[in-house]
Amino acid sequence: VPWLGKVILGTTDSPRQDVVREPLPFKEEVAFILNESARYLSRAPKQEDIRSIWVGLRPLVKPQDEDGGNTKSISREHTVLASRSGLVTVTGGKWTTYRAMAEDVLQKCFDTGVLPPKAAGITNQLPLVGSPVGAVQHSISDAPGIHLYGAEAAAVASLPGSAKELGGGLTEAMVRFAARFEYARTVEDVLARRSRLLFLDARKAIDMAPAVAGILQEELGIDPQLPAFLALAQQYLRPEM
């Protein structure tokens, strides 16, 4: 899948018994993905082509009439359940359908009386932050990556360091914007959540981390947790096979 100038290869379907915050990949999974990709790409990918590798655990809702042994047959759709106590639970699903999941949760709350019924929601017409209403043209310089901010581009360009590239598509101003307006508080917030550099190129994220930490320290005056990020990012480097 093409993504932000890179290519994501995956996925695997390996049941796991351990539940940890940052699961590590199985070497067999990495080998499987490389071997399968070689069947479809003009040049077979190799270990040294890997820039970052990560694992996520997907919650699947097991049907009551199945033993759950074959995870491939279990639906990837989300499920909303309401208990007798009034607890409403959403499980399964994926981040890309978060709005639909939220709507279904609220509808379940209305249907079960947990919340008083309200008129139809506005989610379908609600623009995301930064989405301009109509065409908007800003008199700003061609700062790197500034187009990604939509209607907030002018605000990013007005901050110190808008032309100072740190690498990985980030400028100093983007880090400042993340700290001031996007509630970024740590290096991980910036390099893994406000941007996706950790997932695109772990080594580059490691190299940039001290500069990002310095900007956050200047902006916020708090510990940006640089050592914690460096330890985390090491796990995203390709494993030795």
Task: Locate the predicted segments by residue.
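C-terminal accessory subdomains/tails of enzymes that are appended
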Residues: W3-K6, T12-M241
